[in-house]
Swiss-Prot record:
This is Cytochrome b. Disulfide bonds: none annotated. One of its GO terms (biological process) is mitochondrial electron transport, ubiquinol to cytochrome c. A ubiquinone binds at residue 201. Heme 1 (or BL or b562) is low-potential and absorbs at about 562 nm, and heme 2 (or BH or b566) is high-potential and absorbs at about 566 nm. Its cofactor is heme b. Its main location: mitochondrion. Heme b b562 binds at residues 83, 182. Coiled coil: none annotated. GO terms for cellular component: mitochondrial inner membrane; respiratory chain complex III. The chain crosses the membrane at residues 33-53, 77-98, 113-133, 178-198, 226-246, 288-308, 320-340, 347-367. Heme b b566 binds at residues 97, 196. InterPro entries: Cyt_b/b6_C, Cyt_b/b6_C_sf, Cyt_b/b6_N, Cytb/b6-like_sf, Cytochrome_b, Cytochrome_b_C_euk/bac, Cytochrome_b_N_euk/bac, Di-haem_cyt_TM.
Length: 379
């Protein structure tokens, strides 16, 4: 008799996606991050749901409701810190996942890659709106500064900002709509994840060599399920350690001060995972130019498949491209550090140099080095 998992209409889909899925035998731990992101999304939706049961999206009570969650709700402090630090874990996994895709040439699956870029934007939007909800000083001023960037759009900028704010400043209407969108977006993200997986399973997974692995496939279960579970344990241990030992390590102390429109914090900055883009924004002295650079710093991922000049897919056997890739990683770390520093000498010039290098490496140096490698290999 045929197994029910192969005949049942619903189980059949799950079976072909997670059990009998043929997977390349050479996948390294860099392929764990997709499933880790799924766990992160699950943790965020669950903790967020329970937080939403106690949170009030009103400027008068939002800050106090978060305090109430931490002090009076059973394990409310745990929910709150799991949710806040879970976002950090989400972005760590997200950036490593994108980095893996860049290194091993996974972007040649253009549909999967483009849905991934949409997912990245959706997660960034969700995280930004979530940061506004506790209604602390950095929540309020972060929302004011970032939404105000849209006023740089010619003709419609000012009206667009007021439309998003629901008034002439960040206020009750803004907080309420941000809460509504923050609640809604994770479910849209879940739908996009399904589309992402649908496109991935159309082509099959890439592997570290970048060479088609059709002759050498193994079933996903038990080989990769057990490997994924090990990844879950490592990540959840790290998250638990962060939450239980230093929950405020990645947060901003200013967010423990209730929002006050009359008092500006000395340094307005977003959460650490946006600092690289924030540094690029600040390094251009023109408002519209800065906004365009900010958007392009992420959107540049969409043109990477066009810029792929190498005859080889993966960087595994391309040492010169590897050097450039790790230089790009170093530049991103530098930008993240600069984003958290005040706007003064020497940070300004370091940020500008790193921003130029970021675009130069991706747009010019990587394609040029790929062509050189082709020539050296007599292709």
């Amino acid at each position: 008799m045929t197994n029910i998992r192969k005949t049942h209409p619903l189980l059949k889909i799950i079976n072909s996606s997670f059990v009998d899925l043929p997977a390349p035998s050479s996948l390294s731990s860099w392929w764990n991050f997709g499933s880790l992101l799924g766990v992160c999304l699950g943790v965020q939706i669950l903790t967020g749901l329970f937080l939403a049961m106690h949170y009030t999206s009103d400027t008068a009570t939002a800050f106090n409701s978060v305090t109430h969650i931490c002090r009076d709700v059973n394990y409310g402090w745990l929910l709150r810190y799991l949710h806040a630090n879970g976002a950090s874990m989400f972005f760590i996994c997200l950036y490593l996942h994108v980095g893996r895709g860049l290194y091993y040439g996974s972007y040649t699956y253009s549909e999967t890659w483009n849905v991934g870029i949409l997912l990245l934007f959706a997660v960034m939007a969700t995280a930004f709106m979530g940061y506004v909800l506790p209604w602390g000083q950095m929540s309020f001023w972060g929302a004011t500064v970032i939404t105000n960037l849209l006023s740089a759009i010619p003709y419609i900028g000012t009206e667009l900002v007021q439309w998003i704010w629901g008034g002439f400043s960040v206020d009750k209407a803004t907080l309420t709509r941000f809460f509504a969108f923050h609640f809604l977006l994770p479910f849209i993200i879940t739908a996009l994840v399904m589309v992402h997986l649908l496109f991935l399973h159309e082509t099959g997974s890439n592997n570290p060599t970048g060479i088609p692995s059709d002759p050498d496939m193994i079933p996903f279960h038990p080989y990769y399920t057990i490997k994924d579970i090990l990844g879950f344990l490592i990540m959840l241990t790290a998250l638990s350690a962060l939450v239980l030992f230093s929950p405020d390590l990645l947060g901003d102390p200013d967010n423990y001060i209730p929002a006050n429109p009359l008092n500006t914090p000395p340094h307005i900055k977003p959460e650490w995972y946006f600092l690289f883009a924030y540094a690029i924004l600040r390094s251009i002295p023109n408002k519209l130019g800065g906004v365009l650079a900010l958007v392009m710093s992420i959107l540049i991922l969409a043109i990477i498949p066009i810029l792929h000049m190498s005859k080889q897919r993966s960087m595994m056997f391309r040492p010169l491209s590897q050097c450039l890739f790790w230089l790009l990683v170093a530049v991103l770390f530098t930008l993240t550090w600069i984003g958290g520093q005040p706007v003064e000498y020497p940070y300004i010039i370091i940020g500008q140099t790193a921003s130029v290098l970021y675009f130069l490496i991706i747009l010019v140096l990587m394609p040029a080095v790929s062509l050189m490698e082709n020539y050296l290999l007599k292709w």
